[in-house]
Amino acid sequence: MSQEKQVFSIDLAGRQLTVETGQLAKQANGAVLVRYGDTAVLSTATASKEAKNVDFFPLTVNYEERLYAVGKIPGGFIKREGRPSEKAILASRLIDRPIRPLFADGFRNEVQVVSIVMSVDQDCSSEMAAMLGSSLALSISDIPFEGPIAGATVGRINGEFVINPTVEQQEQSDIHLVVAGTKDAINMVEAGADQVPEETMLEAIMFGHDEIKRLIAFQEEIVQAVGKEKSEVKLYEVDADLNQAVREMAEKDMHSAIQVHEKHAREDAINEVKKRVIEHYEAQEADADTLGQVNEILYKIVKEEVRRLITVEKIRPDGRKGDEIRPLASEVGILSRTHGSGLFTRGQTQALSICTLGALGDVQILDGLGVEESKRFMHHYNFPSFSVGETRPMRGPGRREIGHGALGERALEPVIPSEKDFPYTVRLVSEVLESNGSTSQASICGSTLAMMDAGVPLKAPVAGIAMGLVKTGEHYTILSDIQGMEDHLGDMDFKVAGTAHGVTALQMDIKIDGLSREILEEALQQAKVGRVHILNHMLSVIAEPRTELSAYAPKIITMTINPDKIRDVIGPSGKQINKIIEETGVKIDIEQDGTVFISSINQEMNDKAKKIIEDIVREVQVGEIYEGKVKRVEKFGAFVELFSGKDGLVHISELALERVGKVEDVVKIGDVITVKVIEIDKQGRVNLSRKVLLKEEQEKEAAKEENKQEQQ
């Protein structure tokens, strides 16, 4: 490969995409700088020279955000980037998933793919640039990668599909789809949608694949020009004689163990066979490498038999039919003090979701590379070790938990009511209590139940289902509601969430070379049937959102003030607003358009705070009549409080009809008198009159007396 800088360009969605090689990071096995519009991403690929002594492929994909890319300095005391943001973790997963299946079985060399985002143009996706850069860095390197792959974002505006939509277009789009794959097939889909029909989602996937083919052809040209020769790597293989011996010893018993229906009993039966075989070789003083190979052979026996049973005999590990869903059970309102809770159980998978409602000030503030600054709807997913009957240290959420939480959030977001209709921040937490496959989809079902229990007026209830596929040659079986073993040993994990009207989220990972359109179509339709079945079960537990919020949820009052008066409510250095909060114990959030949200558990305090704000922003008009309290008496007149924060002066000459010698002869401090606004001067001072009202009253009495005399 030439070390001179070379530049390659292609048009992508009306914007130029440029790839530069040979100048940066030349000690990596492969490195490219991808420029897309003003977005710039440096992608590198490196690999260890020797294979690692592990029983899996050690691939790490990192998508690294740098705040200098958007001209920001990190907050906090340290002033440098810390742990990856949620968006960065999701982008890393997005790149990892289509790349991972394209390394040969038995490849054990450690591979690290790093993409550093160096400049961001919001209309030109840094994730898509990083995906293309990661594929190219691997493809031009000497690492034995069977790519290239490419990805594309697809939107839909007014029924028309759009590739890599701009920020403005994304706001109008009812689909946000990321599709990735090779030139021959799709191997990864990640999508959010606004209740879009299955047929439309399939069309969008195929539309994205057409663009992928063009981007792969572009990459192949670059590989032809600057690619290194792939290195010869010895793949991990088990010894043929050992393979035969282990199979003769274990195959029959393992086949029987696999057909035990209950998860833990099946695992115990399989482990018993494994233990017997391992002990046999330990007695012969086999070394660690041999024992590792024995474990590998035993795993393959299980995998082959499970796949054969599903594809040929149409028997699933737990005895279900291909489209059969495990027994369902649901419950709501099981936690008294929470704002809403939902327990969803599907076979041996169980999720407890809790909904918490907060004021709009409780939104999550995002400090990243995107345009979005805050988030009022959140879904967090926790997967404790006890859910699978294991022990391990309790740490913060890993990549998988963040990914599953984001999938649930994407599935539910389209049905969350607008801020105008429901001025609350909504946080969902899904606790996985039991796991045997499809926990992310169980968390979606549990979250829907929790929000309905909390009284969130959802546009429609959402349910999710995980589909699987096992394909051997021309034989294939599509599985509804896959359990852990089917997910682990199958060829596809295809999660579909949505309402009765359409899809709201889709996530697909394929471990084989790819799927035909026909199989995808069949899987989507089978998923729809399963989803509707689950929805009907959920609606039998709670038919619609509760009409009243929990007694423990905050009550929110919305009011509108003149935007020019916002500064009066806040006061100098926030003194006024802090005084209201201290006096009433409420939370106050003010939007730039003058919308004010007052929230607390106590409705009485909300009303009190509202009255205070109304008084602050209330404007005095000439001609208005007030009943006010005398606050101060001077020689020239009396100061009267019309309402909180607003005083006016009744001059001594305006106190009474007759001449007044001393103000105190008519009023004293604390008296409540009725006054009329007669003038507001240029300095905003309010002049009041009691005399005018007394005169009007006198004239009314005189007119009444005159009428009385005429009638006599």
Curated annotation (Swiss-Prot):
Q: Please state the protein's primary subcellular location.
A: cytoplasm
* Subcellular location field: Cytoplasm
Q: What is its EC number?
A: 2.7.7.8
What chemistry does it catalyse, as a reaction equation?
A: RNA(n+1) + phosphate = RNA(n) + a ribonucleoside 5'-diphosphate
Q: Name the Pfam families on file.
A: KH_1 (PF00013), PNPase (PF03726), RNase_PH (PF01138), RNase_PH_C (PF03725), S1 (PF00575)
Return the InterPro entries for the record: ExoRNase_PH_dom1, ExoRNase_PH_dom2, ExoRNase_PH_dom2_sf, KH_dom, KH_dom_type_1, KH_dom_type_1_sf, NA-bd_OB-fold, PNPase
Annotated GO biological processes are: mRNA catabolic process; RNA processing
Give UniProt keywords alphabetically.
Answer: Cytoplasm, Magnesium, Metal-binding, Nucleotidyltransferase, RNA-binding, Transferase
Q: GO terms for molecular function, please?
A: 3'-5'-RNA exonuclease activity; magnesium ion binding; polyribonucleotide nucleotidyltransferase activity; RNA binding
Question: Record's GO cellular component, any one?
Answer: cytosol
Alphabetized PROSITE patterns for the sequence: KH_TYPE_1, S1
UniProt keyword annotation of Transferase present: yes
Q: Where does Mg(2+) bind?
A: D487, D493
Protein function = Involved in mRNA degradation. Catalyzes the phosphorolysis of single-stranded polyribonucleotides processively in the 3'- to 5'-direction.
The record's similarity note reads: Belongs to the polyribonucleotide nucleotidyltransferase family.
Name used for this protein in its record = Polyribonucleotide nucleotidyltransferase
Q: Please name the gene that encodes this protein.
A: pnp
